[in-house]
């Protein structure tokens, strides 16, 4: 994804209407909403590129549950979202982490970054996903860390790493099942290992996995775990599985544990907003306990929350719309429609 350099800033003294903390799908769509409501914004993200987890961890993963896209890659979705946002020319600050947010006497906010920069805005929207995150690793493989990124992978940056390999996938959630299905067309053989009796993934994907098992394309071991591995020099050769009945050794040249992430809100906990678990408590307008600070996407906590890309986009729309009441008090907030914008341009 290319971002026109005119939008990228290292430091800017201009006061924006909204500072968006986080450049994942929720943050990018928040910029779209800002543009539609005729307010300007700045996106700040600690990563070197936009996209959050989608581009940092799973750029080639295919997504099937976003409305309007029967199938789209993670990187492709971010590309499309950015094409929407770019028309409004949001300022983008990459490679710098927000470490503090202070509310000023006039109700505006000063945002401080790790590199010593300060940014000012009239409202703040936190769309930081899981906060700081790292993949959960298998503790029994601590003596094989030298094989990580060559034979043992905890994320998939390129599916080519698994081409014509004997792959063992560990996990039972959506990521594990999605990648298992995707690898069937790439790897020499795929084995799926899950420590529980049932999978915790979408029913359709689970059905696809069992169908692949019936045709011999996939081996499935439930109530099982990878006890250890065997390696020849710097290459994985076998995985040792502990099953309900016995311990077995199978050929494996790639190991892909996909067992979730460890998340940490980090400095966000010290910003004076109410925290709930590993998220930020918000009301039905996506506003936090500090007036003028909003949260959207996976980091936002409210009753009935679903952690999906499309709900994150909805969160962003609600947050931006309500922020207008704070940014422009007394002005009537009008509902904006994309079709209305198109007709305005034609006129």
Swiss-Prot record:
Keywords: FAD, Flavoprotein, NADP, Oxidoreductase. PANTHER family: THIOREDOXIN REDUCTASE 1-RELATED-RELATED. SUPFAM superfamilies: FAD/NAD(P)-binding domain. It catalyses: 2 reduced [2Fe-2S]-[ferredoxin] + NADP(+) + H(+) = 2 oxidized [2Fe-2S]-[ferredoxin] + NADPH. It comes from Chloroherpeton thalassium (strain ATCC 35110 / GB-78). Binds 1 FAD per subunit. The keyword NADP applies. Homodimer. Its EC number is 1.18.1.2. The keyword Flavoprotein applies. This is Ferredoxin--NADP reductase 1. It comes from the Bacteria. FAD binds at residues 26, 45, 53, 58, 98, 133, 298, 339. One of its GO terms (molecular function) is NADP binding. InterPro entries: FAD/NAD-bd_sf, FAD/NAD-binding_dom, Fd--NADP_Rdtase_type_2, Ferredoxin-NADP_redctase_2. Signal peptide: none annotated. Belongs to the ferredoxin--NADP reductase type 2 family. Its cofactor is FAD.
């Amino acid at each position: 994804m290319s971002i026109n350099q005119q939008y990228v800033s290292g430091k800017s003294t201009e006061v924006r209407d909204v500072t968006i903390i986080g450049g994942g799908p929720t943050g990018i769509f928040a910029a779209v909403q800002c543009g539609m409501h005729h307010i300007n914004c700045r996106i700040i993200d600690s990563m070197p590129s936009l996209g959050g987890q989608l581009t940092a961890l799973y750029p080639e993963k295919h997504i099937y549950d976003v409305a309007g896209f029967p199938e789209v890659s993670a990187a492709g979705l971010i590309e499309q979202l950015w094409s929407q946002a770019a028309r409004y020319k949001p300022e983008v600050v990459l490679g710098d982490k927000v470490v503090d947010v202070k509310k000023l006497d006039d109700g505006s906010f000063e945002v401080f970054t790790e590199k010593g920069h300060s940014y000012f805005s009239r409202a703040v929207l936190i769309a930081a996903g899981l906060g700081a995150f790292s993949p959960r690793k298998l503790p029994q493989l601590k003596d094989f860390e030298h094989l990580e990124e060559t034979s043992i992978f905890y994320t998939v940056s390129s599916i080519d790493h698994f081409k014509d390999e004997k792959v063992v996938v560990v996990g039972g959630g959506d990521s594990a099942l999605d990648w298992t299905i995707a690898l069937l067309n790439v790897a020499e053989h795929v084995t799926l290992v899950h420590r529980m009796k049932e999978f915790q993934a979408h029913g359709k994907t689970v059905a696809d996995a069992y169908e692949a098992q019936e045709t011999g394309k996939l081996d499935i071991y439930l109530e099982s775990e990878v006890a250890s591995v065997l390696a020849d020099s710097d290459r994985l050769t076998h995985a040792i599985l502990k099953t309900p009945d016995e311990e077995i050794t199978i050929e494996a040249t790639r190991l892909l544990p996909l067992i979730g992430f460890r998340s940490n809100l980090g400095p966000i906990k010290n910003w004076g907003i109410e925290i709930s678990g590993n998220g930020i408590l918000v009301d039905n307008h996506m506003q936090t306990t500090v007036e003028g600070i909003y949260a959207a996407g996976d980091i936002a906590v409210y009753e009935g929350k679903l952690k999906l890309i499309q709900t994150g986009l909805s969160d962003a729309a609600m947050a931006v719309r309500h922020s207008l009441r704070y940014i422009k008090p007394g002005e009537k907030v009008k509902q904006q429609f994309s079709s209305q914008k198109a007709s305005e341009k034609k006129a």
